[in-house]
């Protein structure tokens, strides 16, 4: 034990260590990312190679209402991860029952159903599932949810129009079609 302290004192006297301390949250994120098994319809992107706590996910649904679109999400993993879920936001304005106009996402495992045993992979797969099976019973965009349950064909038309950058009910949406 004394030897460790003397080594630390010597290191401090020589200008300290260039190594940054790795937090428990960073270790868990490293583990989750190393175990990712994403389908070909999803891809991660790290704007800063040094910052694994902030990254983006791209989802390209290959079936359902949102087929042909490309949806980008930002992930912010806070220092309390995995005891708190990551913060996830959609970076585009999309017409979706579970995504509001500011990009907030309604996914139960990002709120009350979060458990520390859940991984980033589980969140990413949950996001993909929202595009395959939108959930009108737990909406953030109530207009889209109502349209989906009241008139599915019109909802489908509204989704296609909004994905092309059109307006629905006076609200303009971002073009998310794959180029």
Swiss-Prot record:
PROSITE patterns xref list: UBC_1, UBC_2
Broad EC category: transferase
Location of the active site: 106 (glycyl thioester intermediate)
Catalytic activity: [E1 NEDD8-activating enzyme]-S-[NEDD8 protein]-yl-L-cysteine + [E2 NEDD8-conjugating enzyme]-L-cysteine = [E1 NEDD8-activating enzyme]-L-cysteine + [E2 NEDD8-conjugating enzyme]-S-[NEDD8-protein]-yl-L-cysteine
GO cellular component term of the entry, any: nucleus
Pathway(s) per entry: Protein modification; protein neddylation
Catalytic activity, EC: 2.3.2.34
GO molecular function, one term: NEDD8 conjugating enzyme activity
BP GO terms, sorted: protein neddylation
InterPro entries: Ub_conjugating_enzyme, UBQ-conjugat_E2_core, UBQ-conjugating_AS, UBQ-conjugating_enzyme/RWD
Domain UBC core: start-end pairs: 24-168
Protein keywords: ATP-binding, Nucleotide-binding, Transferase, Ubl conjugation pathway
Family note: Belongs to the ubiquitin-conjugating enzyme family. UBC12 subfamily.
Role description: Accepts the ubiquitin-like protein NEDD8/RUB1 from the UBA3-ULA1 E1 complex and catalyzes its covalent attachment to other proteins.
Protein name: NEDD8-conjugating enzyme UBC12
Record organism: Yarrowia lipolytica (strain CLIB 122 / E 150)
């Amino acid at each position: 034990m004394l030897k460790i302290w003397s080594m630390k004192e010597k290191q401090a006297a020589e200008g300290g260590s260039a190594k940054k301390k790795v937090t428990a949250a960073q270790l868990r994120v490293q583990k989750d990312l190393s175990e990712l098994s994403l389908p070909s319809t999803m891809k991660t992107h790290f704007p800063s190679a040094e910052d694994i706590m902030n990254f983006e996910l791209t989802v390209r649904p290959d079936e359902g209402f949102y087929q042909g679109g490309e949806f980008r999400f930002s992930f912010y993993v806070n220092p309390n991860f995995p005891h708190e879920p990551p913060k996830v936001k959609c970076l585009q304005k999309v017409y979706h029952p579970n995504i509001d106009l500011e990009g907030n996402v309604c996914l139960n495992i990002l709120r009350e159903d979060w458990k520390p045993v859940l991984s980033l992979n589980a969140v990413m797969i949950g996001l993909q599932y929202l595009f395959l099976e939108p959930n009108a019973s737990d909406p953030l965009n109530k207009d889209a949810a109502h349209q989906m349950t009241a008139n599915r064909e019109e909802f489908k038309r509204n989704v296609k129009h909004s994905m092309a950058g059109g307006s629905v009910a006076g609200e303009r949406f971002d073009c998310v079609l794959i180029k």
